[in-house]
């Protein structure tokens, strides 16, 4: 099932090219807003799944193109993001030590929304194409063998980043938790629709140009291991988001006016816009292109990204 919020956060289910309003079927779930409605629905899923399926079977819905799609999981209690979690197409000899960071839930935006680049001296702004797992039940100290049974569903996720901010060592919080730096959606797909989450192609386009193109089978620490490890540190609750990392080789600068599209196989296509009032610019190059060009000029050089060309903070 593909769950989504639309218009004024009505709960819907995707049915082909239409969305069926199922708000009436979940009216009995205690909630104060769309965030805890989704979290509580996930927690009580066994009692509502058949009811929603029946409503979808009977309903014709309205064209999904006629509605405004909202973030499908607008109020997670936490967003845990796996760090350096891909083998980078075999260029790493071994996985990096397992690691993660928190991203603020207030960073979430959805389909058609705008990521706003702040007035800070970042070396570059990027967005990492990722697949996220959404937790389905309370999860604490679970084994790797059990971990996937705690997943409710999957969705597209962008890990927005303002890289290179001073001072050195003061990194993840101010780089990752900016408002609008967590686009998700367009919908949440339940696990029964995803045969193998470790074999999904992920693609990201910037203004229609394919920039990232990799598979979840390139993860250094798979989804089950990641969830098991995270749950050994803190309890995960229904609706919590686990972003599983990215292959960095296709990362590229996000700039004012860009249209970004992210599609993970089976999870739909998320699109959103970029706004930068300072109109800063960078060369339109991926990290892989930067590496290859630098090595041609200086053997052993390995720059992560292209320098800023114009605008405030350019050097």
Language-model segments: which ranges?
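Residue "hotspots" at secondary-structure boundaries inside conserved domains
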Residues: 4, 71-72, 78, 123-125, ...
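N-terminal non-catalytic cap/leader segment that marks the start of a structured domain
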Residues: 1-98, 261, 281-315
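A generic local secondary-structure boundary/capping motif
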Residues: 1, 68-71, 88-90, 116-125, ...
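Short, conserved beta-strand element in jelly-roll/cupin
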Residues: 101, 132-137, 228
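RNA pseudouridine synthases
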Residues: 135-138, 142-157
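Residue-level recognition of short, solvent-exposed, well-ordered loop/turn junctions
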Residues: 74, 110, 126-128, 237, ...
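Catalytic-pocket segment enriched in acidic/His residues
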Residues: 48-53, 60-68, 95, 116, ...
